[in-house]
Amino acid sequence: MLKRITGILIPLLTCATLIAQDYVMFETQYLELTNGGHAQLQAGVKKHNDKYHNGENGTAKAYLWYVNTGPYAGQYNWAVGPTKFSDKDKQLSGGHIKDWENNVEKYARSHGHIFMMRDEEMTYNPENETVGENILMKRIPIKNGQEHVEAVEEAVQKIARALRRTRSNIARRVYRDAFPDGHQVITLVYPFSSWSEFEGNVRGLPEGFQDSYEKIYGKGSFRKEVMDVLSAHSDGVTHEIMTMVK
């Protein structure tokens, strides 16, 4: 139970003030319905979070998102943070574990536990937000081999530089799995306020960003340095749109 409740995905992520610490990390996990319906699980998670993960008395706050798209569409993502590794030294009480079993595990199977650590160098976060109510999460599984890792990192880094130079008002937070299983995965987290932002071809980055990028790096550079690099050095990109359940 301890492993199931303390494991975690998600970059993740309205605005919360970042507590002073050396790194930003979230524990995340997916919840797949197994018994009962959405209403029961949502109510159960809210009850558990309000009691044990409310951000008071030194506890990290927990959040729940509904996954609208991607490989886990129809499931939920539960995240707690920002948190520290040292927080894992504190053993959960019997009452805490029992409450999780009665209010969450009774209705859902947890899986996909990840410790998501934010990469500040690759992150562009103008408003210093930590958690987003609605987020687009892009996962990039990198092919095995240092040359593949370096190529994808450079592509992601150059986008961050372009966002800074253009002073974009759209954030893009970048996370890594602290304990990768197999190949490395870079997760890009884009907060959004309205689904209308996805009309047209915009998928996270600002509208017209490709033109802005090429004004900095040269004509054709976006396809060569981003699209072609991801095609050659990753195993594709998944898109998960998550909306917070309050």
Regions of interest found by a model, annotated:
Residues 20-246:
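Short S/T/G/P-rich N-terminal loop/turn motif that feeds into the first structured element of a domain
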Residues 1-23:
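Bacterial Sec-dependent N-terminal signal peptides
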